[in-house]
Swiss-Prot record:
Species this protein is from: Vibrio vulnificus (strain YJ016)
Protein purpose: One of the primary rRNA binding proteins, it binds directly to 16S rRNA where it helps nucleate assembly of the platform of the 30S subunit by binding and bridging several RNA helices of the 16S rRNA. Forms an intersubunit bridge (bridge B4) with the 23S rRNA of the 50S subunit in the ribosome.
Protein name per UniProt: Small ribosomal subunit protein uS15
Stored SUPFAM superfamilies: S15/NS1 RNA-binding domain
Annotated Gene3D superfamilies: 6.10.250.3130, S15/NS1, RNA-binding
Residues making up the signal peptide according to the UniProt record: none
InterPro entries: Ribosomal_uS15, Ribosomal_uS15_bac-type, uS15_NS1_RNA-bd_sf
Tagged with keyword Ribosomal protein: yes
Gene Ontology CC annotation, any one: cytosolic small ribosomal subunit
HAMAP family, sorted: Ribosomal_uS15_B
Length: 89
């Protein structure tokens, strides 16, 4: 249920702040959002898959923590990121 290498590379290229940037909060949140969106279809087909649902909730929690960190660090970057990703915040 993970993303393939080409998809990850495209996301990193779109959200990186510089060359070789894979660890910035923007990149991490974008990758988590793509994984979360990818799992949505799986859960529509497999409603009883509670083991994977726990992993999904971990991803959502990690994304929230990264967004909270970014919001406290740089509000403009935070607002730009949630607008680009289409998150409801």
């Amino acid at each position: 249920m993970s993303l393939n290498a080409e998809t990850k590379a495209a996301i990193v290229a779109d959200y990186a702040r510089g060359e070789g940037d894979t660890g910035s909060p923007e990149v991490q949140v974008a990758l988590l959002t793509a994984s979360i969106n990818h799992l949505q279809g799986h859960f529509q087909a497999h409603k009883g898959d509670h083991h994977s649902r726990r992993g999904l909730l971990r991803m959502v929690s990690r994304r929230r923590k990264l967004l909270d960190y970014l919001k406290g660090k740089d509000l403009a970057r935070y607002q730009d990121l949630i607008k680009r990703l289409g998150l409801r915040r």
